[in-house]
């Protein structure tokens, strides 16, 4: 997973003018390889904690990236591969995708957010079963339990991710970014506090170029819109 290291995520942040970012593995066998077991095998407790923090810092950058990130999962997404997948806003996969957290069989816990994100995305009881038993789930099961939104053939996967990114890109970037911020921040708050977050972000959209452009286009029945994220 450290393909997405600090340098890589910093470079990704330079793409912030884009409206959505699909990510996928190279090839059809795996989405992202997990951490190097040989490297981890000699870590001390302090080094293990630091290793986990390194991964979590990277994955949080993806999770809090200003624009929507779409994971197009092809093949295996195990351990860190599943954890980076869960850091993305939207997950779709190919019909050969396999998801799982094998860490307990190695004598460790998931270390890059797996215990926290999986239990927030799917039912906590099922998340516990997957983590405790180290069982893998296939693409059909992943869709059934809400880990992914859709399943495609291997050839359809990347075009589907690009199509979804383009569909998102047709909307006002300033609004989409505010929606992401509202959802992500609100999930960690009591409802009364979360509603206040939404109200503030809702208000922040008014008198922006994109709000004026979007509403003018609607009122005049103009199809073309010139959104500029401002």
Task: Name each model-derived stretch.
Residues 58, 62-64, 72, 78-132, ...:
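CoA-thioester-processing core
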Residues 216-230:
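Terminal low-complexity tails and localization/encapsulation signals of metabolic enzymes
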Residues 16-43, 61-72, 90, 94-98, ...:
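A structural preference for short, pocket-lining loop segments at secondary-structure junctions
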Residues 92-97, 139, 148-196, 204, ...:
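C-terminal long alpha-helix characteristic of the crotonase
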Residues 1-19:
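Positively charged, low-complexity/disordered segments
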């Amino acid at each position: 997973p450290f393909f997405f290291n600090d340098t890589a995520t910093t470079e990704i942040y330079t793409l912030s003018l884009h409206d959505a970012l699909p990510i996928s593995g190279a090839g059809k066998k795996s989405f992202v390889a997990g951490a190097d077991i040989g490297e981890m095998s000699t870590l001390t407790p302090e080094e293990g904690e630091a290793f986990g923090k390194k991964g979590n810092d990277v994955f949080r950058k993806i999770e809090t990236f200003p624009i929507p990130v779409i994971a197009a999962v092809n093949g295996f997404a195990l351990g860190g591969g599943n954890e980076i997948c869960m850091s993305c806003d939207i997950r779709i996969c190919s019909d050969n995708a396999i998801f799982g957290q094998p860490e307990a069989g190695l004598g460790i816990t998931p270390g890059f957010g797996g215990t926290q994100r999986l239990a927030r995305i799917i039912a906590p009881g099922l998340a516990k079963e997957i983590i405790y038993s180290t069982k893998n789930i296939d693409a059909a099961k992943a869709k059934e339990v809400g880990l992914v939104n859709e399943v495609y053939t291997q050839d359809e996967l990347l075009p589907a991710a690009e199509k979804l990114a383009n569909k998102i890109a047709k909307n006002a970037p300033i609004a989409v970014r505010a929606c992401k911020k509202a959802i992500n921040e609100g999930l960690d708050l009591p409802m009364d506090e979360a509603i206040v977050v939404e109200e503030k972000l809702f208000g922040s959209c008014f008198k922006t170029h994109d709000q004026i452009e979007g509403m003018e286009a609607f009122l005049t029945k103009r199809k073309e819109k010139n959104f500029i994220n401002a």
